[in-house]
Amino acid sequence: MTTIVEEEPLFYIVMLSIGSFFALGSIIIAVILILQHFIHYNKPNHQKYIVRIIMIAPIYAIHSLLSLFFKRQFWALFFDISRDCYEAYVLYCFFKLLICFLGGEEALKELLSKKDTQPLTWPLGYFFSFTPKKSFYRLSLGLVLQYAIIKPTLAIVAAILYYNNKYLEGDFSISQGYLWITVINNISVLIALYFLVMFYEVFQNELSPHSPILKFLVIKSVVFFLFWQTVVITVLIWFDALPKSDVYSSEHIGYFINDFLVCIEMFITSIAMGICFSYSDYVIDKSTHDEILGNGKRSSSRGIGSRSGRNIKISSKIKNIKNNFNRYRHNIGDGLSDVNNPKDIILDTIMVAKLNKNNNNTNNNEINNGIIDNNNSNNIENNGKSRNNIENNIDSQDYFNFIDLNTNDKEKQSKSKYFKIKMPDSDQSSLINLDQCESPSILYGSLNGASNNNNNNNNNNNNINNNNNNNSNNSNNNSNSQFESIDINSNSVNSNKNQSDAILFTF
């Protein structure tokens, strides 16, 4: 310590001393709060996320203190990587905590099914509105999770660029990676925070008993405010607006100021964490709560004011603390195990990736189905024109070959210039001119197996009438309609297709 005092400027010694005091205070407050949550570990699904969130204050404090001590030299880069990874992780944990407050994923999806249309979060709410559905949860989770992935990834990229002389903090030139990484980080965190706010607004009434506003402000101040504080100081360094000293440049002084401020801010953050993430919400037995605090209320009636009474009170406190530690050591072990288990974020990442893949496949299928439907509509329209353009001078032998839906004789399905299509038990028929068709294939079929079962002809006619009245819903309501595509060149059945009428032609 003597060496530091003799060789370092006074302002640096003051910053390091005061920063150490506040960093140590932040660590003590956070550790006490975490232990209290572990002792009353009655809702693991809630408290494991709460403990992870509380840990950001001591982690930031330790990072800033070490960065200040090492003067942001070699080790500071690794501190930044670890801090950035955990910062993004905390935002994800807060989102999962909100889901737990709502009763879990299944309860959340049930709530979404009952939501009405509402405007988007400011400023887009002036122009757009939306109706939250089940997909809103998946979208919000994915966009919060993207920050938890992009932030540490860019931190690792920054380390690689740094060792290749392509990354220099405070250098906003296009050739350096600092500018691009800062821009991408800013966009990523804005998207994550925007959808986090939107998620809160959708479930504002359901989350109000848990006082989420203060919790969100604490998280936002750590994630968003500190990011912009670093950017502002970096800009001041870039414009050489900070003072210099005989030992350190304005760049080093800017980094010292930033690390010093973070140490103080994390002390305030730890106090705020103790208020908005209190363990008292998870205390079941109030008498146990008194014993854990060691206030000696159960033995306070013994000779208060006397020396022996004070000794009994002190020994009672020690005994209570010891007994409670033995009693709740399993809770502490379970809490440490849950907090350090990254299974949830891994499973959520895999789930979002699979859902996005399935959505892409679904969208492609919908597009393909839309194309097929359009082609079918065009084919039906062209077929209608073909039926209306039958020539008057048709040769009599061209009428010979026709498809009769009342027969199973495939030999009659030979190639001909014209085909006569006869409805089951109906005198109506239609003619098709194959010369006007690009591909000589025709759809024939029956409703409820009418061509194979003559006993159901009356029902078939009723179904045909119903199908004609419900063409817009034929894909869902006519599951009994079976049509087979016949290639007239090969006289073979190609596929089965549901349609809404007994006469449909595609070529």
UniProtKB/Swiss-Prot annotation:
Keyword terms, alphabetized: Cell membrane, Glycoprotein, Membrane, Transmembrane, Transmembrane helix, Transport
Record SMART domains: Solute_trans_a
Biased composition (Low complexity): 451-500
Membrane topology note: Multi-pass membrane protein
Pfam families with a match to the protein in the record: Solute_trans_a
InterPro entries xref list: Ostalpha/TMEM184C
Disulfide pattern: none
Compartments (UniProt record): Cell membrane
Transmembrane segments: 13-33, 50-70, 88-108, 141-161, 179-199, 222-242, 260-280
Protein name, as recorded: Transmembrane protein 184 homolog DDB_G0276041
Source organism: Dictyostelium discoideum
Gene symbol of the encoding locus: tmem184B
